Every structure is written in structure tokens, then in C-alpha cells.
Amino acid sequence: MADHNPDSDSTPRTLLRRVLDTADPRTPRRPRSARAGARRALLETASPRKLSGQTRTIARGRSHGARSVGRSAHIQASGHLEEQTPRTLLKNILLTAPESSILMPESVVKPVPAPQAVQPSRQESSCGSLELQLPELEPPTTLAPGLLAPGRRKQRLRLSVFQQGVDQGLSLSQEPQGNADASSLTRSLNLTFATPLQPQSVQRPGLARRPPARRAVDVGAFLRDLRDTSLAPPNIVLEDTQPFSQPMVGSPNVYHSLPCTPHTGAEDAEQAAGRKTQSSGPGLQKNSPGKPAQFLAGEAEEVNAFALGFLSTSSGVSGEDEVEPLHDGVEEAEKKMEEEGVSVSEMEATGAQGPSRVEEAEGHTEVTEAEGSQGTAEADGPGASSGDEDASGRAASPESASSTPESLQARRHHQFLEPAPAPGAAVLSSEPAEPLLVRHPPRPRTTGPRPRQDPHKAGLSHYVKLFSFYAKMPMERKALEMVEKCLDKYFQHLCDDLEVFAAHAGRKTVKPEDLELLMRRQGLVTDQVSLHVLVERHLPLEYRQLLIPCAYSGNSVFPAQ
């Protein structure tokens, strides 16, 4: 036998060598071996032709498998015929087995130092049986996918091997035995909770999920919205929360109607300064609400500052061709603002916000017109004096173009800086002159008593349902109407007769005897047919128990006492 190296890999050859080293060299005597010895003696004395035929039959009877038939026949046809024991079978396997491992690739069949934790189990299993040794020495993660142990879960082992091949570029792991066991444990835990990553060749694009379409965040739009919301004063934000409030004319969306020039760093700084002056307006208004002259003066200063900022933004544009579209856009915006101002003045003139508001609005419009005229005068002055100089010409053309929006800016600031209305004024202003929501007039309600449903008719419908139930077949609507008419006539006559009878006899409470006497006069109750018999004929037991305490029918009593 070959020398046995205990640290070699667990290949079929090494496993068989270990079994041969640890097994007993002498096979125990069994009854089957006695028969085998007799056959061997018979084979030695037989002719060569008979010998070949009997060896074939014995090999077929012993093998019971397609793989070992040729090997056993070949071994027995050789010169020395040995008994078919496990030891001889293992020797034959060692003679015919290849040097390379069947279960593992060539790259894995290398001497790997075994950990110390596995050595005691090997020593114990050497004294024991083969079944206890093979599962411990078998590496779970390096098995080929097609040759798995029968007691293992195929899906988990396949996925672990596949994931290991994907992680290492389709090359199996060359880690030690202990690390392989630990990695297999962690990967089995990972496989229970997550799906392994599949390579590009295995993925099918038709079955893959589409990634969710997420819109990219537009930082520019976010900053623009933030700037628009920061421009609105807090009093306007609070006014928008009032019920049925009118939309403000100077809301931040008005800024988008003016033509915008491309911004630069200096223009942004000037616009920020203009916004600071604009936001300082509500503070002025809160500090001195009762001083209209100071309020108007502060407002005029803010308007001039904003106009200067607007002039600085438009000063970057040079030439008459670039001023003309700006001038046209400003004229269109001025027309729109004038129309809105006319509508606002009409609403104020109707008395929706009180005469004091009308006077205040007129004062503001006069101030804005005066400021506009001053702006035009100032614009004409520098334009005439500095005709030769280049820089003065550039400054004069935006001033002449922005003389008209000065009044617009004044009106806009006037609307932003208007004092917050008192609670009474807010209630008055909540009633719009032009109704936005059309309110329908309430329906006239009748104050009289509700028409009650006739209980007589309700009772008739109940009896009609009973009639259709006892008919035990579908009935047409006309037949049900006829039944209802007959029942109506019958109950009407019965009620009239009962009323006349009770009034004639002076009864305050109608008793069953009175009803029986009335029905006898009507011919329904006779000497042959009593009231109880009539009730038994036409009413079931449940209704009879409610109407009468006891009913006699022959020798039986209903209900049973």
C-alpha cells in the first residue's frame, strides 16, 4: 500500500487508503464465504471454457450494478481469483481510479494544513465506522453542484457555490478548512435573507424589475420657490389663510410678468439690497401705524431704492435695440397693473372696505403719480445734459426706459405695505363684489307636519307578502294588486262593522267575545265552524299562540299545557 499522509486532501483515493489502513486485514468468516470457497475450488478444476462462463455469472450475481460489472469480471479473469470482500473491492477501485479527484477540480487538490479542531474527530472516527467519518471530512462549500450529498439541501449549496464563484471571478476559494466552514455558515445566513447577485449572463431582462423612476432634484427651482416665499410679507401669508379671501394683486407671481435680463453677481447683490429695503416696510408700518406722512415718506424712499436697483440691473444692457423690448414689456405690464388698479379702485368705491380705505387708496395713488412724474423729470435731465459722454448715455437710456415702471413699483409696494385690516374690516372684505362661488338659494322647507304613512296600507302590504309566501309560486304584480284590493275591502268592512258594534253596545274595550259575535253576524263563524277552528285553519301555530291562550282541535291541545 502507498504511504498515508494524514494532512492530504479528502479525495476518493485518500479516503480509501485510510479505510484500508484502519480496517482489519483478515475478513471474518461468514456462511457466504464458505459457498464462495466451494465455487472457487470448482472453478479451479473446471475447463477453461467452463471457467470463463461461470466467472461471468458469479460476477453478475455479486455486483448488482452496471458500473462494477466490467471491473469484477476483469479482476476474476486475471490469474489470481480472490474473494469479493470490501478490502478487495477497495483495492480494485484504487487500481482503476484516476490520480485526480472526481469531486473537486484540479486547482483545489493541494495540501492544506488541517486545523486542530478537526483532528480529534478524525482519531475518534478512525476507530469507528465509515459513516461517521465521511460527513465530517466532506467540505460543504467545495462540492461540485452535480455531486451533492443526498441529505443536504441542494438549493443552498448551489447558491453558495455560485455566489463564491461570482465573488472570486469563477475561481473557487483556496482558504483553509476552518475559514471555509465559517464562510459557509455566514453565507447560508445571508442566503436566507437576501437574494444572491446573479451575473450578467444569467439575468433575463424580460423578468427583471424596472427601477423606480425618481425625478432629480432641481436646485434652481427649489431656490426660486424659496426666494418667492421669502419675498411675501408675513401679513400677506396670514391674510391668505382667511376664508373667502381675495387673491392679492401684488402676490409673488406678478414678478414673473416682467421681462427678466440675464443675472450677474453684481445684479444679484443689488437685488438683495432692494429686497432688504422692501422687507423693511412692514417694520416701518408696525412702528408708526398712525403717522401717514412718515409712512408715505418711507414708502417713497423704498420705491426709489428699488427703482435704483432696477436701473442697475438694466444698466448692463447697452444700445437702443436692447432697450426697446424692455420698454414694450414694461408698457404691457403697466397696462395690466392699471387694469388691476382700476378694478381694485372700483371695489373700494363700492364700499366693501369702508370710506377710510378709499381715501387712503386715493392718497397712495396720488403719491405714486407724483413720484412717477418726478422720475420722468429726473430721467429727462441727465439724458439731455450728458449726450456726448458714453457712460452718461448708458445711464440715461435705462432711466428713460424705467421711468414708467417706477409707478408700477410704487403701486406694488403700496399693495405689499398696506396695513393689515381690522377684524371688522376683514369680515367686510370677505364679501366679494364679484361672487367667486355661486350660492344657490336654499330650498323652501314646508313647516307643516310630515305626511305619515297609513298604517292600514302598511298592514295590507304585509298581508300581501304573506299571501305570496303561502301561494308557493311566483305571482304577477297585477295579481298582488288585486289581493291588496280584496284585503282592503274586507278589512274596511270589518273595521266599520266593529266600530258600529262597539258604539252601539257602549264598549270601551273590544273583547274576543265581541269580535266573535260580529263575525257570527257576518256569517264567518257558525255553529259548525267556531272561531278557534277558523283561526286554526287560516293561521299557523306561531300566530295562534299570540292570539288565543288555548285552541282545541279534536283530542289535541295547542299549545300543549
Curated annotation (Swiss-Prot):
Domain text: The largest part of the sequence forms an elongated and flexible stalk structure that is connected to a C-terminal globular domain with a histone-type fold.
PTM text: Dynamically phosphorylated at Ser-47 and probably also other sites during the cell cycle. Phosphorylated at Ser-47 during G2 phase, metaphase and anaphase, but not during telophase or G1 phase.
Residues that bear Phosphoserine: S47, S343, S345, S356, S373, S385, S386, S397
Record protein name field: Centromere protein T
Region (Flexible stalk domain) residue spans: 93-421
Quaternary structure (record): Component of the CENPA-CAD complex, composed of CENPI, CENPK, CENPL, CENPO, CENPP, CENPQ, CENPR and CENPS. The CENPA-CAD complex is probably recruited on centromeres by the CENPA-NAC complex, at least composed of CENPA, CENPC, CENPH, CENPM, CENPN, CENPT and CENPU. Identified in a centromeric complex containing histones H2A, H2B, H3 and H4, and at least CENPA, CENPB, CENPC, CENPT, CENPN, HJURP, SUPT16H, SSRP1 and RSF1. Interacts (via N-terminus) with the NDC80 complex.
Keywords: Cell cycle, Cell division, Centromere, Chromosome, DNA-binding, Dwarfism, Kinetochore, Mitosis, Nucleus, Phosphoprotein
Protein family (similarity comment): Belongs to the CENP-T/CNN1 family.
Broad class of the protein's primary localization: nucleus
UniProt keyword Membrane, yes or no: no
Function text: Component of the CENPA-NAC (nucleosome-associated) complex, a complex that plays a central role in assembly of kinetochore proteins, mitotic progression and chromosome segregation. The CENPA-NAC complex recruits the CENPA-CAD (nucleosome distal) complex and may be involved in incorporation of newly synthesized CENPA into centromeres. Part of a nucleosome-associated complex that binds specifically to histone H3-containing nucleosomes at the centromere, as opposed to nucleosomes containing CENPA.
Single GO BP term: chromosome organization
Protein encoded by which gene: CENPT
Organism: Homo sapiens (Human)
Disease note: Short stature and microcephaly with genital anomalies: An autosomal recessive disease characterized by growth failure resulting in severe short stature, severe microcephaly, and delayed and dissociated bone age. Additional features include global psychomotor developmental delay, pubertal delay and genital anomalies.
Biased composition (Basic and acidic residues): 18-27, 357-367
Modified residues (Phosphothreonine): T85
Subcellular localization: Nucleus; Chromosome, Centromere; Chromosome, Centromere, Kinetochore
Bias (Low complexity): 34-46, 395-407
Chain residue ranges for the region called Disordered: 1-83, 256-292, 333-457
GO cellular component: chromosome, centromeric region; cytosol; inner kinetochore; kinetochore; nuclear body; nucleoplasm; nucleus
GO molecular function: DNA binding; protein heterodimerization activity
KW Amino-acid biosynthesis (keyword) present: no
Biased composition (Polar residues): 276-288
